[in-house]
Amino acid sequence: MCIRDSITDDIDRGYGHVLCTHTGLVVAYGAVVFDGEPAYAEIDGTWLDQAPYVVLHRLAVAQEVKGQGIATEFMRRTMTLARERGTGSFRIDTNFDNRCMLRLLAKFGFVRCGEIHYAGDPRIAFQKIL
């Protein structure tokens, strides 16, 4: 599935979230999923717990605002939304070479739990207890 189809599917399922400036300019997008992630059922490693969790996929920040804390704010808002819904855990995966995401996850104290396969590709799996 191409990224455009993935985003359309996210929106259809109610997963698509955007972060906007005060003027309404969309500066970030992510799929915030509370239904679980089938790819997380098998992990080469161990999750921190087995409680319900939120997942974030496809976090993207507009090029013109990179380096301005937009991804950090999106993560904060995702965690707030999870807490408001009574979800105490946040799982996420990323490519091994995604340095920006790896730094962001370290900043928020995510724990590396192992490796999963998402869409056929190996990914590093992380979790944070909220």
Q: What role is predicted for each listed range?
A:
Residues T8-D12:
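Short loop/turn motifs at secondary-structure junctions and domain boundaries
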Residues M75, A82-N95:
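Conserved GNAT acetyl-CoA-binding A-motif
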Residues R58-V61, G67-T80, R103-K107:
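Conserved acetyl-CoA-binding loop-helix of GNAT-fold acetyltransferases
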Residues F34, D93-T94, A106-A125:
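Conserved catalytic-core motifs of GNAT/GCN5-like acyltransferases
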Residues R13-G30:
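Conserved beta-hairpin
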Residues A31-R58, K66:
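Conserved acyl-donor/pantetheine-binding loop and adjacent beta-alpha core of acyl/acetyltransferases
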Residues T72, E84, F96-G114:
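Conserved active-site alpha-helix within GNAT-family acetyltransferase domains
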Residues M1-D5:
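Conserved small/polar residues in nucleotide/adenosyl-binding loops
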